[in-house]
Amino acid sequence: MNALLTNPFKERLRKGEVQIGLWLSSTTSYMAEIAATSGYDWLLIDGEHAPNTIQDLYHQLQAVAPYASQPVIRPVEGSKSLIKQVLDIGAQTLLIPMVDTADQARQVASATRYPPYGERGVGASVARAARWGRIENYMAQVNDSLCLLVQVESKTALDNLDEILDVEGIDGVFIGPADLSASLGYPDNAGHPEVQRIIETSIRRIRAAGKAAGFLAVAPDMAQQCLAWGANFVAVGVDTMLYSDALDQRLAMFKSGKNGPRIKGSY
């Protein structure tokens, strides 16, 4: 029988190790595999803002499977039915967006666990996650390999952060800088001093609660700052942004009047 896969990403978070990631928004398995050969610790495959279908996510999971980079799937929302599908195609680590309350966090955690610990629907014999029924006792042991991360990205979520951190089954909390800054009254300005202060205090609160703290920083200096504050899973770029910047930079070498890449401070 096939052995249940371990989750190196979750194990490293448990140990407090720093993991550097990359955001994948290009929606193709080809680009995902290129990224997986680069050496990033983790790759966020985005189903919220990138136009990924379940089948697209499935193909990208297949593409990165032979490599050391660990995939994290972000579905468009945290419904029980969508979480079930994403887990069944083999995702072991989920990042659920827009979690504002402890009750939402509990519902999401329940959706990732089989009964009696949760409400995940049973279908292991037709699921890639269970190797189509070939992993012995899959349902009994799968919880240990699942990693659940939730996004805190609104003023409401910040007000409820301590309660969210207390929810059993939540392994880490990710600060969403773009939506958070907009919610705080500073749209498209995650670098505002007040937003920066709140990001710092939030990261420190998350780590003090014994949870992993995550962030996406497309500016290298911001990534370094978040690491200094204690964030231990940080994405340092977005594939589509890096690609467009490289295209602009190359064209500017050969066409007069063309500007190089615009420096972007946020996602």
From Swiss-Prot:
One Pfam entry name: HpcH_HpaI
Active-site residues, as the UniProt record annotates them: H49
Natural source organism: Shigella sonnei (strain Ss046)
Binding-site residues, substrate: Q151, A178, D179
Gene designation: rhmA
UniProt-recorded name of the protein: 2-keto-3-deoxy-L-rhamnonate aldolase
Cofactor, free-text remark: Binds 1 Mg(2+) ion per subunit.
Entry-linked InterPro entries: Aldolase/citrate-lyase_domain, HpcH-HpaI_aldolase, KDR_aldolase, Pyrv/PenolPyrv_kinase-like_dom, Pyrv_kinase-like_dom_sf
Protein family: Belongs to the HpcH/HpaI aldolase family. KDR aldolase subfamily.
